[in-house]
From Swiss-Prot, chain A:
Keywords: Activator, Chromatin regulator, Nucleus, Transcription, Transcription regulation. Component of the SWR1 complex which mediates the ATP-dependent exchange of histone H2A for the H2A variant HZT1 leading to transcriptional regulation of selected genes by chromatin remodeling. Component of the NuA4 histone acetyltransferase complex which is involved in transcriptional activation of selected genes principally by acetylation of nucleosomal histone H4 and H2A. Residues 126-175 form the SANT domain. One of its GO terms (biological process) is chromatin remodeling. GO terms for molecular function: DNA binding. It is found in: Nucleus. The gene is SWC4. The lineage of its organism: Eukaryota, Viridiplantae, Streptophyta, Embryophyta, Tracheophyta. This is SWR1-complex protein 4. Pfam families: DMAP1, SANT_DAMP1_like. Its main location: nucleus.
Curated annotation (Swiss-Prot), chain B:
The gene is TAF14B. It is found in: Cytoplasm; Nucleus. GO terms for cellular component: cytoplasm; NuA4 histone acetyltransferase complex; nucleus; Swr1 complex. Residues 1-36 are annotated as: Disordered. Belongs to the YAF9 family. Disulfide bonds: none annotated. Residues 229-263 form a coiled coil. It comes from Arabidopsis thaliana (Mouse-ear cress). Keywords: Activator, Chromatin regulator, Coiled coil, Cytoplasm, Developmental protein, Differentiation, DNA damage, DNA repair, Flowering, Nucleus, Transcription, Transcription regulation. This is Transcription initiation factor TFIID subunit 14b. PANTHER family: PROTEIN AF-9 HOMOLOG.
Length: 441, 268
C-alpha cells in the first residue's frame, strides 16, 4: 500500500503487468435451412451439405402452341415532318401485327427556346449593338441547332464571337423572365437569374486555358520551380514568426507578475556575475515562470529525490518547445560530451545543467533567426536587381555550420576511490599509497 | 576535510537563500506567530548512495549459489543517516526466504547469496518530525561485470552504485534543531537573528550507542562521487555555447544592416 502510494505521488512508471483475459465470444452456429423444391427425404440423404448444383425448375416450360414469324413490314416515324415510309423486319407472334410508333422516335429531343413577340421586343429587348433582325436570326439558329453556339457562330451571317452570341441570348432570356414574372421574387431562383453569364470571365477563362495548353515543357518546369521556391519562403517566414511568439507570451507573464506585485519565486539559477543580454531575458522569464510553478508543485511533496526534481524542471522547460527542438537540445548535449542525466546530481550540478539547457535553446532560436534573415535578404536582393544592377552577389554571408565535432570534446572518466570525500581540486597531487583502487566498471 | 567541504557547500548556497529567508523572516515578524512549525524557502538535502557489491564465490559457486552480494543505502560519505531515516524496507525477489526485509538500524543493508539479477525496491521511512511519507528507490541488482573479456575473480567484486540526494523542502523546527551541524546533511545557513532551541542530550547519548557506519566492512569497495568533474564539464560546455551565441548575434546584426541597405536602395 505504502509503496503504491509513493509511486503515485512520485509519478514513477512502475505499473504491474495487466493480466486481464478477454472472454472469447462463442461463434454462432449456422443453421442449414432446407431449400425449396427438394423433399425432406432427399435433403436428409445429403446429410446437410449444400447441394453442388442448383435445383432446376422443371415446371416452367415455354408454351408450345405459340407461333413466331418474321415479316417485312412498313412503318412511320413521328419524329419526321414528311410522310416518308420505310420498311424493316418485324417479329410477329400469333399473326398479331405490331402497333404503335417507331420505337426510336422518343429520342428526338429538342430544347425549349423562349419566344418573344414584337411588342415584347420593343418594350424590353432593344439593344444598341444588336438589331431586331439579328436577334430573330440568333433565336432561330438556337432553335435549329439546339444551343450549340459553336455551330451557330459558324453559320451566323454577321461576324460575332461565341461569347457575344451567348451574352445576347442569355441577357434576352433574363429580360424576358423578369418582364413576364409577377414580382422579382418569383424568378429569383431561376438558374439564369442566380448564375448569370459573365462574358468577361468566360473570355479570360478561355485565354488562360489556351495558354496552359500551348505552353512548352521547359516553361512548365520553370513554373514548378518558382512555385516550390515560393512555398519554401512562406514556410520559413511562418517558422520565424512561430519562433518569436513565445517572447510575446513571456512578456505577458512579466506583465502579470508586475500586476500581482509578487516575485514569482526563488531564482533557480545561481547568482551569476555577468548580466544576461536583453534578447535573452524574455525566454528566461518564460522558463522562470515554469520553474516557479514546478518548484511550487515539488514543495507540495514533503520529500523528493534530486533527480526527480531535475526531471520535472527539464519537462517544464521542454513543454514550451516542440519535440524536434528537444531532440536537437539533447543531441547538442551529447556532442558537447555532457551527460543527459548528471552522475552526481547535487544542487549546484543540477542548476548548472538547467542553465546549459536554457542557453542551448537560445542558441537554436538564434540559428533560426539567422536563417530567416538570410532568406529575407536574398529575396530582397533578387527583387532589387532592376533598381540596382551593380549590386554584387559576393556580399552574401555564408553561415558557419553548427558542429561541435571539429572541436575537441571534453570527456573525463570519473575517478573512483575508497571511502572519504575527494578533494575539491580536480587533480590531487598526492595519492595515498595505502588505499586500494576500486574496480573500474 | 568533511567540515570544510560542507561549509563550502553552505557558502555556495548562501547567496540564493539569504534574501528569501530574510523576506520570510519579515513575514514572520509581521504575523508575530512564534509557534509556526515549518520554515519556508529552506530545504535540507541528504546526499545518499544506493547500490550493491557482489562477490563471485569461486570454486564454491554452484548453479544456484554463484554470488554473495549486499544491497544497501548509505550516506554519500558513509555518514550515519539514521538521524533522518527510521527504517528501510528492502523488497527482494519472491524466490527468497522472507523477501521483504525491514532494517531498522544502520547500516541499512541486506546480505544474501544467489545467482539471479533482478529489481530491488527500497522504501525509506523517516522519523515522525522529518516526513510522514516514505520514499522509494529502485536498483537493479548487478552480479556479472560489464566487460566479458576478463575471467571471473573472487578478489574484485562487482560494484554498481547511484548517487542521489533526498530533498526536504519546508522542514520542521524540531527536525532542524535535532540535525543541526550533522555531517550527513547539507544544512542551509540560517539568518543571523534566528536561534534554534538547544538539542536534547538524551538523543545524543542514544546515538553514540548505535553501530558506527564509518568503519564499514565493504567500505574499501565503495565508489566516490565528486561533483567537481561534472561541474567542470558543464562549465566548459556553457562556455562553448555562449561563444556560439555571441557569434550568431554578430552575424544577425551584420545581416540586418545589409538588409536595411538593400531596402533603402529599393525604395530609391
Amino acid at each position: 500500500m505504502g509503496g503504491t502510494d509513493a509511486k503515485d505521488i512520485l509519478g514513477l512508471p512502475k505499473t504491474p503487468l495487466s493480466l486481464t483475459q478477454e472472454k472469447k465470444s462463442r461463434p454462432q452456429k449456422e443453421s442449414h435451412r432446407k431449400p425449396d423444391g427438394i423433399s425432406r427425404e432427399v435433403y436428409a440423404l445429403t446429410g446437410g451439405v449444400a447441394p453442388l448444383m442448383p435445383s432446376i425448375d422443371l415446371k416452367r416450360r415455354p408454351p408450345a402452341d405459340e407461333k413466331v414469324a418474321w415479316k417485312w413490314l412498313s412503318f412511320t416515324n413521328s419524329a419526321r415532318k414528311d410522310d416518308l415510309q420505310l420498311y424493316h423486319w418485324v417479329r410477329v407472334v400469333n399473326d398479331v401485327p405490331p402497333t404503335g410508333d417507331y420505337s426510336f422516335a422518343k429520342y428526338n429531343k429538342s430544347v425549349d427556346i423562349l419566344k418573344y413577340t414584337d411588342e415584347e421586343y420593343e418594350n424590353h429587348l432593344t439593344d444598341s449593338v444588336w438589331t431586331k433582325e439579328e436577334t430573330d436570326q440568333l433565336f432561330e439558329f438556337c432553335q435549329n441547332f439546339d444551343l450549340r453556339f459553336v455551330v451557330i457562330a459558324d453559320r451566323f451571317p454577321v461576324s460575332r464571337t461565341v461569347e457575344e452570341l451567348k451574352d445576347r441570348y442569355y441577357s434576352v432570356n433574363r429580360a424576358l423572365l423578369r418582364a413576364r414574372a409577377q414580382s422579382p421574387a418569383d424568378v429569383a431562383n431561376h438558374p439564369l437569374m442566380k448564375e448569370p453569364y459573365d462574358i468577361t470571365r468566360d473570355r479570360e477563362r478561355k485565354r488562360a486555358l489556351s495558354m496552359v495548353l500551348s505552353q512548352s515543357r521547359h516553361q512548365e518546369k520553370k513554373d514548378a520551380e518558382i512555385l516550390a521556391e515560393a512555398k519554401r519562403i512562406t514556410e520559413m517566414r511562418l517558422a520565424a514568426r512561430r519562433a518569436e511568439e513565445p517572447d510575446v507570451s513571456a512578456n505577458e507573464n512579466a506583465g502579470l507578475d508586475k500586476a500581482d506585485g509578487v516575485v514569482p519565486g526563488r531564482s533557480v539559477s545561481p547568482t551569476s556575475n555577468s548580466q544576461l543580454p536583453a534578447t535573452a531575458v524574455a525566454p528566461s522569464t518564460l522558463t522562470m515562470a515554469d520553474y516557479a510553478s514546478t518548484l511550487a508543485s515539488l514543495r507540495m511533496l514533503h520529500v523528493y529525490l534530486r533527480t526527480y526534481g531535475l526531471e520535472q524542471m527539464v519537462q517544464a522547460a521542454s513543454s514550451a518547445v516542440g519535440l524536434r527542438t528537444i531532440k536537437r537540445v539533447e543531441q547538442t548535449l551529447q556532442d558537447l560530451g555532457v551527460n543527459l542525466k548528471p552522475k552526481v546530481p547535487t544542487k549546484t550540478v543540477c542548476d548548472e545543467h538547467l542553465e546549459l539547457r536554457k542557453e542551448i535553446l537560445t542558441l537554436l532560436n538564434l540559428q533560426k533567426q539567422l536563417q530567416y534573415k538570410e532568406s529575407e535578404g536574398s529575396s530582397h536582393r533578387e527583387g532589387s536587381y532592376a533598381a540596382m544592377p551593380d549590386t554584387p552577389k559576393d556580399r552574401v554571408f555564408a553561415p558557419d555550420p553548427f558542429s561541435f565535432g571539429a572541436e575537441r570534446p571534453i570527456k573525463k572518466e570519473q575517478k573512483r576511490k575508497g571511502p572519504g570525500r575527494q578533494a575539491d581540486t580536480p587533480s590531487p597531487a598526492h595519492k595515498r599509497p595505502r588505499k586500494l583502487k576500486a574496480s573500474d566498471l | 576535510m568533511t567540515n570544510s567541504s560542507s561549509s563550502k557547500k553552505q557558502a555556495q548556497d548562501q547567496p540564493e537563500t539569504s534574501e528569501p529567508t530574510l523576506k520570510s523572516l519579515k513575514t514572520k515578524m509581521t504575523k508575530s506567530d512564534e509557534k509556526q512549525k515549518k520554515l519556508k524557502d529552506i530545504e535540507i538535502s541528504v546526499p545518499i548512495v544506493y547500490g550493491n557489491v557482489a562477490f563471485w564465490l569461486g570454486k564454491k559457486a554452484s548453479e544456484y549459489q554463484s554470488h554473495k552480494w549486499a544491497v544497501y543505502v548509505r550516506g554519500a560519505t558513509n555518514e550515519d543517516i539514521s538521524v533522518v531515516v527510521k527504517k528501510v524496507v528492502f523488497q527482494l525477489h519472491s524466490s527468497f526466504n522472507s523477501p521483504t526485509r525491514v532494517i531498522e538500524e544502520p547500516p541499512f543493508e541486506v546480505s544474501e547469496s544467489g545467482w539471479g539479477e533482478f529489481e530491488i525496491a527500497m522504501t525509506l521511512h523517516f522519523h515522525s518530525d522529518v516526513c510522514d511519507k516514505p520514499l522509494s528507490l529502485y536498483h537493479h541488482l548487478k552480479l556479472y561485470p560489464e566487460d566479458e573479456s576478463g575471467p571471473l575473480t573472487m578478489k574484485k567484486p562487482v560494484v554498481v552504485e547511484s548517487y542521489d540526494e533526498i530533498v526536504f523542502p519546508d522542514p520542521s523546527e524540531s527536525f532542524l534543531a535535532r540535525v543541526q551541524n550533522h555531517p550527513a546533511l547539507t544544512f542551509p545557513r540560517l539568518p543571523s537573528g534566528y536561534n534554534l532551541p538547544a538539542p536534547m542530550q538524551v538523543e545524543d547519548t542514544g546515538k553514540k550507542k548505535r553501530g558506527d557506519t564509518k568503519d564499514h566492512s565493504l567500505g574499501q569497495w565503495f565508489m566516490s562521487f565528486s561533483e567537481a568533474d561534472e561541474l567542470l564539464q558543464l562549465a566548459a560546455a556553457r562556455q562553448q555555447v555562449q561563444a556560439h551565441i555571441a557569434k550568431l548575434r554578430r552575424q544577425i546584426s551584420l545581416l540586418e544592416g545589409q538588409n536595411q541597405t538593400v531596402k533603402t536602395g529599393s525604395d530609391l
